[in-house]
């Protein structure tokens, strides 16, 4: 059998020479024989017998982004509206009818926990005169581990309150009127804040905003993210003189707090 294999290899080599236009190939029969005679290797024994240098230090730990989640420090800061934010809101939530300048407002960076307990970084625009107080409120809410789904400027929703609510977004400044009236909302002056609209819907008769809030009209069935009398959100705002829309008779605006 070995002789047949050797003969086949030699014939194969000559065929390569013929196809290659006369190129010379050295045939080393002993190499072919050695390959044929080679015994299969027991890989377990082979690798087990490799000498190991025990003086090599352990490699440094490289964080796995899918396993080693980084927990950042919470942030609660205020600053004048940055240029890129002015460009974002100009002509959107802040338009020609606004009776004050950009310096009337302040830009907040606020850390909060989402419904999975993850640390998130949100942003709000409020009146500059209450900026520090709002930061204190949300820092208190943060340390109480009250979940807030998201916190984005209304301009990411084309300044349309309904779409922001449908996305369960918590928001403050938006120069607009009170729904169904010509009266300016406290949101128009950066003096009102809405939190978790789905868990805390606006209810007026048969009207429920946002629509998904229908699951939370039973205020006795308390679930995460709901604002109720005595909860951390309620206490943080009410203790500082804010008014809660959930205490109104009609409408009941459970997600709404305002400063007067």
What spans do the regions from the language model cover?
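Conserved short secondary-structure elements within globular domains
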Residues: 149, 156-183, 236-243
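Hydrophobic helical h-region of N-terminal Sec-dependent signal peptides
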Residues: 6-14
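N-terminal module-boundary/linker segments of secreted carbohydrate-active enzymes
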Residues: 25-118
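Positively charged n-region of N-terminal signal peptides that target proteins for export
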Residues: 1-4
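Active-site acidic/histidine clusters and adjacent loop/turn architecture
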Residues: 100-165
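Second-shell loop/turn segments in exported
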Residues: 96, 119-128, 181, 218-225
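Catalytic cores and adjacent binding grooves of peptidoglycan-active enzymes
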Residues: 29-36, 42-53, 178-184, 189-260
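C-terminal motif of bacterial Sec signal peptides marking the signal peptidase cleavage site
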Residues: 17-18
């Amino acid at each position: 059998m070995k002789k047949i294999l050797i003969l086949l290899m030699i014939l194969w080599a000559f065929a390569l020479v013929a196809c290659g236009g006369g190129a010379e190939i050295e045939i080393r029969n002993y190499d072919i024989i050695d390959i044929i005679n080679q015994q299969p290797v027991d890989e377990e024994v082979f690798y087990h017998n490799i000498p190991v240098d025990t003086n090599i230090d352990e490699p440094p730990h490289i964080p796995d982004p899918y396993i080693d989640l980084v927990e950042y420090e919470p942030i609660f800061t205020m600053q004048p509206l940055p240029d890129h934010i002015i460009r974002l809101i100009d002509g959107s939530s802040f338009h020609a009818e606004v009776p004050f300048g950009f310096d009337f407002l302040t830009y907040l960076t606020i850390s909060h926990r989402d419904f999975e307990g993850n640390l998130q970084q949100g942003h709000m625009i409020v009146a500059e005169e209450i900026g520090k107080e709002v930061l204190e409120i949300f820092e208190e809410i943060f340390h109480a581990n009250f979940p807030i789904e998201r916190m984005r400027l209304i301009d990411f929703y084309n300044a349309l309150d309904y779409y922001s609510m449908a996305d369960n977004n918590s928001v403050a400044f938006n120069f607009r009127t009170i729904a169904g009236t010509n009266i300016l909302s406290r949101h128009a002056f950066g003096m009102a804040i809405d939190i978790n609209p789905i868990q805390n819907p606006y209810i007026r008769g048969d009207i429920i905003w946002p629509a998904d809030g229908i699951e939370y009209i039973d205020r006795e069935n308390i679930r995460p993210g709901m604002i109720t009398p005595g909860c951390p959100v309620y206490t943080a705002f009410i203790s500082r003189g804010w008014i809660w829309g959930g205490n109104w008779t009609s409408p009941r605006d459970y997600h709404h707090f305002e400063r007067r």
